[in-house]
From Swiss-Prot:
PANTHER family xref list: AMINO ACID IMPORT ATP-BINDING PROTEIN, METHIONINE IMPORT ATP-BINDING PROTEIN METN
General function of this protein: Part of the ABC transporter complex MetNIQ involved in methionine import. Responsible for energy coupling to the transport system.
Name of the protein in its database record: Methionine import ATP-binding protein MetN
Primary location group: membrane
UniProt xrefs under InterPro entries: AAA+_ATPase, ABC_transporter-like_ATP-bd, ABC_transporter-like_CS, ACT-like_dom_sf, MetN_ABC, MetN_ABC_transporter-like, NIL_domain, P-loop_NTPase
GO molecular function per UniProt: ABC-type D-methionine transporter activity; ATP binding; ATP hydrolysis activity
Compartments where located: Cell inner membrane
Organism: Chromohalobacter salexigens (strain ATCC BAA-138 / DSM 3043 / CIP 106854 / NCIMB 13768 / 1H11)
Origin organism lineage: Bacteria, Pseudomonadati, Pseudomonadota, Gammaproteobacteria, Oceanospirillales
Domain of life from the UniProt record: Bacteria
Membrane protein topology class: Peripheral membrane protein
Length: 347
């Protein structure tokens, strides 16, 4: 449904040029909810604005529903944009118009008749839970209700794609959860493809099917959400995950960690495992079969869209041979193992 091929965006020229996007390839299938995360200034907003050509790429192709938007003339692009709804962090509602009239606005601009506008707006108000707010004005609404109006307005042209630019970052956690539930509901009922950018891992965890990680204008990692939470492939991905899960070794231990193993050290590991493995007596089996003692420093279980994920930080205490055997045993059971460092046994 959405395909970016070698998309780059550069502002300015010469030594002062800013390369906001660098050769981005992205493929979002029809009906998917695809998240893009990254730090502030990484290029997330530029990327999503390139999808509907609010920002025209310096190079590369943007293909939506089989149409290359970068090659369309102004009139064809205007028509294509009807297939691309968009919501933002700020709701951008017209204060002088009611909820109904805000949702109706794009249809008025498209020249839709008043009777057809009513037939299209009322179901959207029902879908977004705003039927009883139809005659109210934005000043009478909460933040979450305003975002629901923005979503309904974005759906008025019956788009095939919804672009979400930090759509929940101005909302409190409870309201964020309700908006995410609404987006999931829209995805299921309408088959809408959703591309969202965010810096909030909770958003990715809650509704995304796949996630991409952008850093300094480059898409450095992309994976199914379950795989990303289990085994992020990059250091930045691990940093995002650990900060979200609050799963870091105690500071006193961090200060003792050494990068390389020695004859009198033992490893400190972060383990991630999912599915049936979560329910197995992992630690007792490991101690029995490999001969190591296991000191659990932190552990937690998360549910990622119905998939159970177990996470643990532990010291494996034993000789180099037994700890090596333990690591091999863990990996043989499809457990993702990250060695954080090594500590002296007599410390």
């Amino acid at each position: 449904m959405i395909k970016l091929e070698g998309v780059s965006k550069t502002y300015g020229a010469g030594p002062t040029a800013v390369h906001a996007l660098k050769n981005i390839d992205l493929d979002v299938p029809q009906g998917a909810i695809h998240g893009v995360i990254g730090l502030s200034g990484a290029g997330k907003s530029t990327l999503i604005r390139c999808v509907n050509l609010l920002e025209r790429p310096t190079s590369g192709r943007v293909i939506v529903d089989g149409q290359d938007l970068t090659r369309q003339d102004a009139e064809a692009l205007r028509q294509s944009r009807h297939q691309l709804g968009m919501i933002f962090q700020h709701f951008n509602l017209l204060a002088s118009r009611t909820v109904f009239d805000n949702v109706a606005l794009p249809l008025e601009l498209m020249g839709v008749s008043k009777s057809d506008i009513r037939e299209r707006v009322e179901p959207l108000l029902d879908l977004t839970g705003l039927t009883d707010k139809a005659r109210q004005y934005p000043a009478q609404l909460s933040g979450g209700q305003k975002q629901r109006v923005a979503i309904a307005r974005a759906l008025a042209s019956r788009p095939k794609v919804l672009l979400c630019d930090e759509a929940t970052s101005a909302l409190d956690p409870q309201t964020t959860a309700s908006i995410l539930e609404l987006l999931q509901d829209i995805n299921r009922k309408l088959g809408l493809t959703i591309l969202l950018i965010t810096h909030e891992m909770e958003v990715v965890k809650s509704i995304c099917h796949r996630v991409g990680l952008i850093s300094d204008g480059e898409l450095v990692e992309e994976a199914d959400v379950g795989d990303f939470f289990t085994a992020p492939a990059t250091r930045l991905g691990r940093d995002f995950l650990n900060a979200f899960l609050e799963l870091e070794p105690p500071q006193a231990l961090v200060e003792r960690l050494e990068e390389t193993a020695g004859p009198h050290t033992h490893p400190v590991v972060r383990l991630a495992f999912s599915g049936a493995t979560v329910a197995t007596p992992l630690i007792s089996r490991l101690a029995r079969d490999s001969g190591v003692d296991v000191s659990i420093l932190q552990a937690k279980v998360e549910s990622i869209q119905g998939r159970t994920l177990g996470l643990m930080i532990a010291e494996l205490i034993g000789s180099p041979d037994t700890t090596s055997r333990a690591l091999t045993q863990l990996e043989a059971h499809d457990i993702n193992v990250e060695v954080l460092g090594h500590v002296q046994r007599d410390a």
